């Protein structure tokens, strides 16, 4: 066993210690370099004053060393790694669902930096995008690679004085000296400031922000409004540069601005805007075209890819549907479907071949198809603002809602009253409920039943006095006393207006015609009125009316008291201490009566003697008026003598009590209880039947309602047609196929000859897999016999194909079969639309990758685009086929579409006249092929036009029911109708689609009109699309 050389170790001890020290020094150097590379260098405790110089420790008068004010910040800076962790939590808020992990497309390597980059930073502008939150900016389809404008700014304070835009400002910050720095951001509306630990965009962290919802904002320079605006102190080094990114979103309100300030982490220092001396460009973009995006940095703040946020959508159309992926199921062989149904001629009566159609009147000859099952294309989430689906007036729905569809359940004891209300017209008064001129005097008599109106001596005859009771006296009427030089003093009592020679009608309008006198017993009317020297007992129950004076308005009518609409001015009262005695009472008119609203309903009380008759010569403004509501007040019957007892008991009040009562009311301010609270019946129930508003719709092309979906086909009809077809199919093949589900049924109705159906069924083959059946069938009405449209292939006699029971029977329409392998060409004219061309090509490549369908081609007609190389972008896109056509001059949509169709050589292929700003569903190719039949059908799908700030993941908008610009048709049919009108629509567009529709219908083709699921037209800005000059300083938005 070898021994340890102890003697040698002792001799070389000094050398071994030296080697150990060198090893430790090398290890510490390695660790230090590694920390520096990660931005967490070993730091010394240094303090920085207001001028940036290092502070020295000082000794106060007591000989104690005073620590610098920044030492607490230095202590906290040692745990910088732990403090930065909470800032990084916003990644999960911005990108939920595991988006916190770094996607593969983050930018880790920065482009070469040059000294001339100093003094400015990169600015990317995303115009015409609604919303005030930064999250709304991230929903933009082109964010962050394809902005509307690329430019630079010289300081981190920007105010374009515009609306509905988003900004992305990025570059490098160069600190002036080493030390701890705080950042703050201020903006209107929301903004976020991201700062990297070094120059790499991948290491950016959110350090300060203004709001998350879009409703938060600050004034310019207001750096301390929100706690989230100010960052934690961060140690920066003057020898390095730090990548930053500033995101800002502005809506259509407020004073737009965004600025970033910084300060040394010292008490009392204010934030200062970061100027050009401390910023530099990320890279120079001045020589790059808009389709060059490899240099654009992608950071955690803004990047492409990753896991998108999973938001709960409110649109039913986004929910999965078997139609979306049914095209991937293998289709049945055409040989298996031969001789299943008997052939029959197909010539619907709604085809207007060779019929003269006026300009733009082809819209009236387009009919809609019925769909089963429900495809949820109805925009239910948009009906809060647009209720046109219900075929009701918007004003009516806003005022009355949907209560007419509900029948309120009757309460016990209210059956007769409710029946009477239902028998009356809604909001119309019954003339029999009003009193004639002779009967109006009865309102002034008494509470006893009146059998006939007593004779009156004149229009101002006083009402008969009530029977005298023991202890009750009535004062005679007293005229108003003159005041201030003979000016008559008006009484504040509630009284009847003087009657003129000719009474005025209750409603100012046409008087009702006189009714012939009918020998009927006069109705007994009980009227509650203000009687002199009487008070209604507060314990007396309120009477109920046999029917409401306004039928249909109140479910439970209440008698209303008579009120004085305009009272005369109150005489001035001396200010002083109020007492309850009569000495403190000022002289007042002897007549004083007051109607109350705050007490029991239908009760009135009087204070003092009766009011005198008012002179008819007084001004109209000072004349006491009785409300019309009081004329309609009807009370129930009252027992004889009941009112007199109440009068006796309540006429004993002293004058002092009256004054005290009035003083207390005046001291309390306005009368309490003047407005009644509505009673709420929480136990009210109602009855309602099933309502299907789809029954109110027809197949007429509705151009007024743009939120309604496809017409719904009744389930019984769809099941009956499917059952007939499956019966014939199994009879032909001996029960080899079993029906799994009905995926889609479309019906075009012809009330004269029959209906056309498109059946799409999922079948299970015996001993095989699942198959897709998608065929047109015709349900011919009994006795309907027509020849073929071109006089060929006469159909057999109707008796040979009509069922014995006389019911319609299915047949196979001749020359109405669609081809599954036909080529589809997308024709798109473009000009200076780099970001939209790139998005369109990306969508087409994704469509090819998802469906595996290579039977389509993209034809781009370029009108000298200057912002990108369209041909190079086409070659770089992963498309199965493409064509590039270059034209000179201004943009002409009609000429561009015609040139694209002329470039297609195969006349038996489909051309789809398309737009650049379209989001296609995955089944778009299958939908175009199914609804285009050569010589028979053309397809004009309805696209959903997205609103500003809306995206396909959260679609808000409306169906473009008037637009026919997206049009699919066989090239042979397109050439036969004459193509596009390039002569009339040369320098303008808008109307060329309607003009083409007129000629297509005149050629005898049907135009299939359906709303496609997930088929959107992106909202986009029209600024700079066709080289239109803009006015400097204009603040009007793009249309």
UniProtKB/Swiss-Prot annotation:
The keyword Transmembrane helix applies. One of its GO terms (molecular function) is acetylgalactosaminyltransferase activity. Residues 1-15 are cytoplasmic. The keyword Transferase applies. Highly expressed in ovary, adult and fetal brain. Also expressed in fetal kidney and lung. Glycans are attached at residue 105. Residues 108-278 form the PA14 domain. CDD domains: Glyco_tranf_GTA_type. Residues 642-666 have a biased composition (Acidic residues). Pfam families: CHGN. PROSITE patterns: PA14 (PS51820). GO terms for cellular component: Golgi cisterna membrane. This is N-acetyl-beta-glucosaminyl-glycoprotein 4-beta-N-acetylgalactosaminyltransferase 1. It comes from Homo sapiens.
């Amino acid at each position: 066993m070898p021994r340890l050389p102890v003697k040698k170790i002792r001799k070389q001890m000094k050398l071994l210690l030296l080697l150990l020290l060198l090893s430790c020094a090398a290890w510490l150097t390695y660790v230090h370099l590694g920390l520096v590379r990660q931005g967490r260098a070993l730091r010394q405790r240094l303090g920085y004053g207001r001028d940036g110089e290092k502070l020295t420790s000082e000794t106060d008068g007591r000989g104690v060393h005073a620590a610098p004010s920044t030492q607490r910040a230095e202590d906290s800076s040692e745990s910088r790694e732990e403090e930065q962790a909470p800032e990084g939590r916003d990644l999960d808020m911005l990108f939920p669902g595991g988006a916190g992990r770094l996607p593969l497309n983050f930018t880790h390597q920065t482009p070469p930096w040059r000294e001339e980059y100093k003094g400015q930073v990169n600015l990317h502008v995303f115009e015409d995008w609604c919303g005030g939150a930064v999250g709304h900016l991230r929903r933009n389809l082109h964010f962050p690679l394809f902005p509307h404008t690329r430019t630079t700014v010289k300081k981190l304070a920007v105010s374009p004085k515009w609306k509905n835009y988003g900004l992305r400002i990025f570059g490098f910050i160069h600190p002036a000296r080493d030390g701890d720095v705080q950042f703050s951001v201020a903006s209107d509306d929301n903004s976020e400031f991201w700062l990297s630990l070094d120059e790499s965009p991948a290491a950016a962290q959110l350090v300060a922000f203004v709001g998350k919802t879009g409703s938060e904002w600050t004034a310019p320079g207001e750096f301390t409004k929100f706690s989230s605006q100010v960052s934690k102190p961060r140690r920066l080094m003057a020898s390095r540069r730090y990548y930053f990114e500033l995101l800002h979103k502005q809506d259509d309100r407020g004073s737009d601005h965004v600025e970033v300030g910084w300060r040394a982490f010292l008490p009392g220092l204010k934030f200062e805007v970061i100027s050009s001396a401390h910023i530099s460009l990320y890279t120079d973009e001045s020589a790059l075209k808009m389709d060059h995006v490899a240099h654009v940095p992608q950071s955690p703040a803004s990047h492409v890819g990753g896991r998108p946020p999973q938001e709960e959508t409110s649109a039913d159309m986004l929910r999965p549907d078997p139609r979306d992926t049914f095209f991937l199921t293998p289709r049945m062989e055409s040989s298996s479907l031969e001789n299943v149904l008997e052939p029959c001629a197909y010539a619907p009566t709604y085809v207007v071949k060779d019929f003269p159609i006026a300009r733009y009147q082809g819209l009236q000859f387009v009919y809609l198809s019925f769909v089963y099952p429900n495809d949820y294309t109805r925009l239910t989430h948009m009906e809060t603002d647009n209720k046109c689906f219900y075929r009701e007036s918007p004003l009516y729905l806003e005022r009355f809602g949907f209560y007419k569809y509900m029948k309120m359940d009757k309460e016990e004891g209210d059956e007769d009253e409710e029946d009477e209300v239902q028998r009356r017209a809604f909001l119309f008064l019954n003339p029999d409920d009003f009193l004639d001129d002779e009967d109006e005097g009865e309102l002034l008599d008494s509470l006893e039943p009146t059998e006939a109106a007593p004779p009156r001596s004149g229009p101002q005859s006083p009402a008969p006095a009530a029977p005298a009771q023991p202890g009750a006296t009535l004062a005679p009427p007293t005229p108003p006393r003159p005041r201030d030089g003979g000016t008559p003093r008006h009484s504040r009592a509630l009284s009847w207006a003087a009657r003129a020679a000719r009474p005025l009608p209750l409603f100012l309008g046409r008087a009702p015609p006189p009714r012939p006198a009918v020998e009927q017993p006069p109705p007994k009317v009980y009227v509650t009125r203000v009687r002199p020297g009487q008070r209604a007992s507060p314990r007396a129950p309120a009477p109920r009316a046999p029917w409401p004076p306004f039928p249909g308005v109140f479910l439970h009518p209440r008698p209303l008291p008579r009120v004085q609409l305009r009272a005369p001015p109150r005489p001035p009262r001396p200010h002083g201490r109020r007492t309850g005695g009569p000495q403190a009472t000022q002289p007042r008119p002897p007549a004083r009566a007051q109607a109350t609203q705050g007490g029991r309903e239908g009760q009135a009380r009087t204070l003092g003697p009766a009011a005198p008759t008012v002179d008819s010569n007084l001004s109209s403004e000072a004349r006491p008026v009785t409300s019309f509501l009081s004329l309609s007040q009807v009370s129930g019957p009252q027992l004889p003598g009941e009112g007199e007892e109440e009068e006796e008991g309540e006429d004993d009040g002293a004058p002092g009590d009256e004054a005290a009562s009035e003083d207390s009311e005046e001291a309390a301010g306005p009368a309490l209880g003047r407005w009644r609270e509505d009673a709420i019946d929480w136990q009210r129930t109602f009855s309602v039947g099933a309502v299907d508003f789809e029954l109110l719709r027809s197949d007429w092309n509705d151009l007024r309602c743009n939120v309604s979906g496809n017409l719904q086909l009744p389930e019984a009809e769809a099941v009956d047609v499917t059952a007939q077809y499956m019966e014939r199919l199994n009879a032909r093949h001996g029960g080899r196929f079993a029906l799994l589900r009905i995926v889609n049924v479309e019906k075009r109705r012809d009330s004269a000859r029959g209906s056309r159906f498109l059946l799409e069924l999922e079948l299970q083959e015996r001993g095989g897999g699942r198959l897709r059946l998608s065929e047109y069938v015709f349900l011919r009405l009994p006795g309907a016999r027509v020849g073929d449209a071109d006089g060929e292939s006469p159909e057999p006699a109707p008796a040979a194909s009509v069922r014995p029971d006389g019911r319609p029977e299915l047949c196979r329409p001749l020359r109405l079969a669609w081809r599954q392998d036909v080529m589809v060409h997308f024709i798109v004219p473009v000009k200076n639309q780099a970001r939209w061309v790139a998005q369109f090509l990306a969508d087409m490549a994704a469509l090819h990758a998802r469906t595996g369908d290579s039977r389509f081609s993209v034809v781009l007609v370029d009108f000298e685009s200057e912002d990108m190389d369209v041909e190079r972008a086409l070659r770089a896109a992963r498309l199965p086929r493409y064509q590039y056509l270059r034209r000179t001059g201004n943009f002409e949509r009609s000429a561009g579409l015609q040139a694209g169709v002329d470039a297609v050589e195969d006349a038996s292929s489909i051309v789809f006249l398309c737009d650049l700003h379209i989001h296609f569903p995955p089944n778009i190719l299958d939908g175009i092929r199914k609804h285009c039949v050569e010589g028979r059908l053309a397809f004009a799908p309805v696209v959903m036009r997205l609103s500003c700030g809306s995206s396909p993941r959260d679609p808000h908008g409306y169906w473009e029911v008037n637009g026919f610009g997206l049009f699919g048709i066989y090239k042979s049919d397109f050439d036969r109708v004459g193509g596009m009108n390039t002569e009339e629509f040369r320098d303008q567009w808008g109307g060329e689609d309607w003009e083409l529709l007129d000629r297509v219908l005149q050629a005898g083709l049907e135009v299939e009109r359906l709303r496609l699921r997930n088929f959107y037209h992106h909202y986009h800005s029209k600024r700079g699309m066709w080289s239109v000059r803009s006015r400097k300083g204009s603040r009007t938005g793009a249309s």
